[in-house]
């Protein structure tokens, strides 16, 4: 279906139109899944967009999405900005509208910035859901919520306090100052700190542009500027190993704690070496899997507004609260359990 539409565009416009499926076929490419569906009829096309396609977090989500696409027999497009870029996300959504995909699922870098494009997709009959980071509610049908913002913020602050003895200075490294989901997490981190751990003090908030090297540079600067700092909290996945490497190179392993939201595989060495104390997350492959299952159900009409549960293949049923499909609670990975996971 997609290739016929592309060929038609080539013939009419004489343009070289490129989306992610024209790029390399490695884990970060926008290539479609090649699974063939069982049964006849129109094959659904689901388009999945990360915040940044080189981020290992979203590559792991894609692995789960690919599994769901294969099981369902749907075509999966995967494309997104190289670096977090709301304007580029809008451009990709516009391309997908032109291609006539059946459903779009987006991890939104900026909820206000992308909502107009998503509303346009809905008006054209495309089913729209968000995952990981939401748009404005009227721009989509459902949000696949990896965990509630409160649950994430509280888990991070509770772990920080436990490691610091409920007092001392800490800093946060985020992806960007405009990332909607991270802004929400920060609100709940601060609410938890103020209500339960008033002797903990946040001394800095630094963006790393979702890049490990920049996170390492920011962490190095934080260590220099804040000699009494007891902990660095990294709330985007590239920032956790970046902060850990900075602490290690500064010779402050054990003196400055490192925690954050990240993947076990990216942080295993630092956790086992005692540089990173804990990594908090959810099963990212399950997030990608659930997102594609939900998008397909929405496109088929088996998932409708007002439903209280959704079936998601091998993962079973998931609760829906309002228009939020809930993956589950955050999970803490540490040196005692990290070798049990491979993602």
Regions found by a protein language model. Give the residues of each.
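Bacterial N-terminal signal peptides
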Residues: 10-18
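Short, intrinsically disordered, low-complexity terminal segments
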Residues: 8-10, 35
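Short linear sequence motifs
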Residues: 2-3, 10, 50-51
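Positively charged n-region of N-terminal signal peptides that target proteins for export
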Residues: 1-6, 65
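A residue-level marker of the well-folded mature domains of exported/periplasmic proteins
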Residues: 21-343
């Amino acid at each position: 279906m997609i290739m016929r539409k592309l060929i038609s565009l080539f013939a009419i416009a004489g343009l070289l139109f490129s989306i992610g499926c024209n790029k390399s076929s490695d884990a970060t490419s926008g290539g479609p899944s090649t699974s063939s569906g069982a049964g006849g009829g129109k094959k659904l096309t689901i388009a999945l967009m990360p915040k940044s396609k080189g981020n290992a977090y979203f590559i792991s989500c894609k692995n789960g999405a690919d599994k769901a696409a294969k099981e369902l027999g749907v075509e999966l497009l995967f494309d997104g900005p190289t670096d977090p870029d709301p304007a580029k996300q809008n451009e990709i959504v516009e391309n997908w509208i032109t291609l006539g995909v059946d459903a779009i699922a987006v991890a939104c870098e900026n909820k206000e910035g992308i909502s107009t494009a998503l509303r346009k997709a809905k008006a054209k009959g495309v089913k729209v859901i968000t995952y990981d980071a939401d748009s404005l509610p009227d721009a989509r049908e459902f949000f696949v919520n990896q965990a509630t913002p409160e649950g994430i913020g509280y888990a991070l602050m509770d772990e920080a306090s436990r490691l610091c003895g409920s007092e001392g200075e800490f800093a946060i490294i985020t992806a960007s100052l405009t990332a909607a989901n991270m802004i929400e997490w920060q609100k709940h981190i601060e609410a938890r700190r103020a209500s339960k751990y008033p002797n903990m003090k946040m001394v800095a908030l630094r963006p790393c542009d979702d890049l490990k090297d920049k996170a390492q540079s920011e962490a190095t600067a934080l260590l220099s500027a804040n000699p009494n700092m007891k902990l660095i909290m990294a709330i985007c996945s590239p920032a956790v190993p970046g902060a850990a490497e900075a602490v290690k190179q500064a010779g402050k392993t054990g003196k400055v704690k490192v925690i954050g939201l990240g993947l076990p595989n990216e942080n295993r060495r630092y956790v086992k070496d005692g540089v990173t104390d804990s990594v908090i997350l959810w099963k990212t492959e399950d997030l990608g899997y659930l997102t594609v299952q939900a998008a397909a159900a929405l496109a088929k009409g088996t998932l409708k507004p007002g439903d209280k549960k959704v079936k998601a293949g091998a993962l079973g049923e998931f609760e829906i609260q309002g228009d939020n499909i809930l993956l589950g609670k955050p999970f803490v990975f540490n040196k005692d359990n990290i070798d049990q996971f491979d993602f």
